[in-house]
Amino acid sequence: MKKNLCIVVLAGALLSLSACAQKGPVLLEGVKYQVPEGTVTGTANVVVGVSPFKDERGKTTSILGKRTISNSVENDLVVQGTVADLVTAGLKDALKARGVTVKDAPVWDLSAETIKADGMNILIGGEIKTLWVDVVSQPLNVKTSAAVQLRVFAADGAEKKIFRTLVLNSKMERQDVAFSFDTTADALSEALSSALNQLLKDDEFKKKIQ
């Protein structure tokens, strides 16, 4: 009797997943920088210019992941705007959370010869190598994997010289009994935040913004 009941429950869950599956791209909202607990907002006496990140993933600029439902239905997960906008905004938020004055900088090709940092002590730009979340939804078993890789360049505005180049890597995995857009966004937010925090924890970079 219990075995038959389990079969009915699983079949019902599978049918529910299929019936609720939305075809086509789905907007994933709420992906953002998460300020670590205990972060102290300082009073940095520098102005940091943030140039728009370049999306080097080789994917559509608004797509940041995929959801697969019971191996039958797939949805692209998309962001409002572009992934480059998302990362650029995340870096700005990370700096502001630490009391750093942030200024929008023009597009930068990441070479020392083209540094334009008027009114900025530091200029930051970078490339998005990876930013992706995969969600596989099975009845009572949802696996989420998020990965972020960024290459970041930091330049001294006065000297017109790149003083730091870092590759930031982060991965995050979780398993849940039910799918939720909130948990998916949280997983990718955590991976993005972890990557950006590596820059903020870098000793040489910290010296420049203190």
Task: Report the location of each language-model feature.
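Surface-exposed patches in mature extracellular/periplasmic domains of secreted proteins
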Residues: 99-108, 138, 208-209
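Short secondary-structure boundary motifs at beta->alpha junctions and helix caps
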Residues: 68-82, 155-201
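A structural "domain/chain start" motif
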Residues: 20-93, 203-210
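Sec-dependent bacterial lipoprotein signal peptides
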Residues: 1-20
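Surface-exposed short loop/turn segments
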Residues: 21-33, 106-161
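Sec-exported extracytoplasmic/periplasmic mature domains
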Residues: 92-100, 196-205
